[in-house]
């Protein structure tokens, strides 16, 4: 991909994307396909109407080299929407717009993904899937020393650990599998000794 801007000469297209960035021309060459200033301005207008928080400077920065996965995602969704739903989209822009999607989608592998948000209590409490102490668990004696011990991550990958007291399995199904380490047996029959399977 070649990204080209110019701030000398006659402005090629009268649009805020060029005016507010002090440019006279802008274009991108993707896979030997020329993407003109007119096309980029058209995409910007639709993008801005769908995602009002974007401005001319942010859009230009993203075109030069995306550094935010969320902005890149909304940019690609906008172009795909234009290609599939926009009846006013000129036919001569279809191939260049498709080339833009093809090139910019490759940036995803280079962008560091944001840390996933989680509603999993075990993930929030455990640091790097290490056991953590809890003050009490319903069904265990109040004076018991209790730990939650993660035994697999969300993908089902087993977590290795050693040196724990007797481990008990809860019958509840959670996204994050864990067992309970206790120095005292449970008061409830719903907890069974975990055999490691």
Swiss-Prot record:
Keyword presence, RNA-binding: yes
GO MF entries: RNA binding
Entries under InterPro entries matching the protein: Tenui_movmnt_prot, Tenui_NS3
Top-level taxon: Viruses
Any Pfam family: Tenui_NS3
Keyword Ribosomal protein: no
One of the GO biological process terms: symbiont-mediated suppression of host innate immune response
Gene Ontology CC: host cell cytoplasm
Alphabetic keyword roster: Host cytoplasm, Host-virus interaction, Inhibition of host innate immune response by virus, RNA-binding, Suppressor of RNA silencing, Viral immunoevasion
Location in the cell: Host cytoplasm
Similarity annotation: Belongs to the tenuiviruses p3 protein family.
Assembly with partners or alone: Homodimer.
Function: Acts as a suppressor of RNA-mediated gene silencing, also known as post-transcriptional gene silencing (PTGS), presumably through the binding of dsRNA.
Name of protein: Suppressor of RNA silencing p3
Highest classification ranks of the organism: Viruses, Riboviria, Orthornavirae, Negarnaviricota, Polyploviricotina
């Amino acid at each position: 991909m070649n990204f080209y801007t110019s701030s000398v000469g006659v402005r090629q297209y009268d649009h805020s994307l060029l005016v507010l960035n002090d440019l006279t021309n802008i274009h991108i060459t993707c896979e030997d396909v020329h993407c003109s200033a007119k096309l980029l301005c058209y995409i910007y207008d639709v993008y801005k109407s769908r995602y009002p928080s974007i401005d001319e400077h942010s859009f230009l920065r993203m075109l030069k080299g995306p550094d935010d996965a969320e902005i890149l995602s909304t940019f690609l969704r906008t172009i795909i929407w234009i290609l599939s739903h926009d009846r006013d989209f000129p036919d001569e822009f279809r191939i260049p717009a498709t080339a833009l999607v093809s090139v910019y989608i490759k940036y995803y592998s280079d962008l560091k993904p944001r840390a996933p948000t989680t509603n999993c209590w075990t993930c929030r409490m455990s640091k790097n899937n290490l056991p953590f102490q809890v003050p009490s668990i319903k069904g265990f004696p109040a004076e018991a020393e209790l730990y939650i011990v993660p035994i697999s991550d969300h993908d089902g990958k087993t977590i290795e650990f050693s040196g724990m007291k007797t481990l008990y399995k809860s019958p509840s199904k959670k996204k994050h599998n864990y067992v309970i380490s206790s120095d005292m047996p449970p008061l409830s029959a719903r907890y069974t000794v975990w055999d490691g399977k």
